[in-house]
Amino acid sequence: MSGGGHGAEAAVAEVLERGRTDPAAAHVFTRTYAADALAAARAADVAAPGPERPLAGLPVTIKDLFDVAGETTLSGTSVRRGLPAAEADAVVVARLRRSGAAITGRTNMVEYAFGGVGLNPHLGTPRNPADPNVARVPGGSSSGAAVSVGLGLAVAAVGSDTAGSVRIPAALC
């Protein structure tokens, strides 16, 4: 986000556009939420600031390992396409929504969160933002989450960590 005194809606629109058009952002997202993110940012622009919405209007991404109501969680694999949709948001997703975050998308990951390099042959591997013109691994399994922050497509990202799944990509990106 470039700042410059514009509101949350303009900043989120800028981030969404960059995510859609920047070649370095290829394979970062498995799904984006432009309309919902812009609505959350618009609400932040008109609401009075308060402690109950500490993330009001800030662009945040979530790893495609956490359920979003009405959607199938892919967990980094195409095999899960067509499986039943989640009935409710994961707790972390529900809390982000309540905090006012503008959730811009679900991020790509290593298949079933099993791997530290960050490669995904099924859904594509996000490019390491440290040098997107060179084939450098982003680390995993929360590869898309780290890349979304590294490219400035989010101010924060939700990942998961069992054996370095957030720490490795955070260090590499």
Where are these regions (language model features)?
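Gly/Ser-rich catalytic/binding loops embedded in alpha/beta enzyme cores
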Residues: 1-158, 162
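Cytochrome P450 heme-iron axial ligand motif
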Residues: 165
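Structural signature of FAD isoalloxazine-binding scaffolds in flavoprotein oxidoreductases
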Residues: 168-173
